[in-house]
Amino acid sequence: MNPNFLDFEQPIADLQAKIEELRLVGNDNALNISDEISRLQDKSKALTENIFGNLSSWQIAQLARHPKRPYTLDYIGYLFSDFEELHGDRHFADDPAIVGGVARLDGSPVMVIGHQKGREVREKVRRNFGMPRPEGYRKACRLMEMAERFKMPILTFIDTPGAYPGIDAEERGQSEAIAWNLRVMARLKTPIIATVIGEGGSGGALAIGVCDQLNMLQYSTYSVISPEGCASILWKTAEKAPEAAEAMGITAERLKGLGIVDKVIDEPLGGAHRDPASMAESIRGELLTQLKMLQGLEMGELLERRYDRLMSYGAP
């Protein structure tokens, strides 16, 4: 199976394989088969639109985890100039599962922070599969407080299965680090915009997700636990993950309807990994619009708005 396609995309993968075969035949034999290729491309587009127009919550969860999906550093490359990565929490270590630093968005200085998964095996291990340890969250907190001092807006990119649950992380105060970030972010005197670009897993996501404006990409997820974890608790088997995903309401549109998400950013047909540059431009437009709005608020109004937003969660 083509690793660029998920199970439910197999019919699309089959059509793409036929198109590639025809291209090779045409190149080898100098045959003009452009009409047939064009017909198959139209068929592939229509099939993709049909499949992606009827995705289940579980299928969206799979897309959010797609190995080719753009990560934080990919978007930093597309969106920002003069990015200077900053390291270390000044307490214990540097955590590669969270990246952050100063950059410019259309010439204006910003602080960028986000989870970072890995592509290859070694990088995945080095970045702990995007699951931060306490030092990652403390690094993020240090950078956010720096942004406040220098009056820079904070832009965060969320993409994690969750905070690392290992013994070493617990020994170094994982829950305290997350809780401290929530406290600090609620009070920071600078605009904060968070964007969920893949998985938004529980407290590991929320620790850089307290904000004035929350965006989610169309095929991202945000939840208190993974569908597999929920299924294992409720049904005693991870095989019930599709049912759990539906019941939990983890998708961008569901969360927008609940008032948790402010903006759902549409993805290119087939997902962000099909056209990362186009996806980045859509994100750029939203960030610039939202920054202009937030920077136009008085500081007291900004903080009151943020507080009211937090207090509204879970209210009838």
From Swiss-Prot:
Q: What is its EC number?
A: 2.1.3.15
Q: What does this protein do?
A: Component of the acetyl coenzyme A carboxylase (ACC) complex. First, biotin carboxylase catalyzes the carboxylation of biotin on its carrier protein (BCCP) and then the CO(2) group is transferred by the carboxyltransferase to acetyl-CoA to form malonyl-CoA.
Q: To which pathway does this protein belong?
A: Lipid metabolism; malonyl-CoA biosynthesis; malonyl-CoA from acetyl-CoA: step 1/1
Subunit comment? Acetyl-CoA carboxylase is a heterohexamer composed of biotin carboxyl carrier protein (AccB), biotin carboxylase (AccC) and two subunits each of ACCase subunit alpha (AccA) and ACCase subunit beta (AccD).
User: Where's it mainly located?
Assistant: cytoplasm
User: From the UniProt record, which GO molecular function terms apply?
Assistant: acetyl-CoA carboxylase activity; ATP binding; carboxyl- or carbamoyltransferase activity
Please state which protein family the record places this protein in: Belongs to the AccA family.
What sequence ranges are listed for the domain CoA carboxyltransferase C-terminal?
39-293
Q: Where in the cell is it found?
A: Cytoplasm
Give TM regions.
Answer: none
Which gene carries the instructions for this protein? accA
What PROSITE patterns does the entry give?
COA_CT_CTER
Q: Which reaction does it catalyse?
A: N(6)-carboxybiotinyl-L-lysyl-[protein] + acetyl-CoA = N(6)-biotinyl-L-lysyl-[protein] + malonyl-CoA
Question: HAMAP family this protein is in?
Answer: AcetylCoA_CT_alpha
Question: Keyword annotations for this protein?
Answer: ATP-binding, Cytoplasm, Fatty acid biosynthesis, Fatty acid metabolism, Lipid biosynthesis, Lipid metabolism, Nucleotide-binding, Transferase
Which is one Pfam family of this protein?
A: ACCA
Q: What is this protein called?
A: Acetyl-coenzyme A carboxylase carboxyl transferase subunit alpha
Q: Which PANTHER family does the record cross-reference, listed alphabetically?
A: ACETYL-COENZYME A CARBOXYLASE CARBOXYL TRANSFERASE SUBUNIT ALPHA (PTHR42853), ACETYL-COENZYME A CARBOXYLASE CARBOXYL TRANSFERASE SUBUNIT ALPHA, CHLOROPLASTIC (PTHR42853:SF3)
Supply the source organism for this entry.
Pseudomonas aeruginosa (strain LESB58)
One GO cellular-component annotation of the UniProt record comes to: acetyl-CoA carboxylase complex
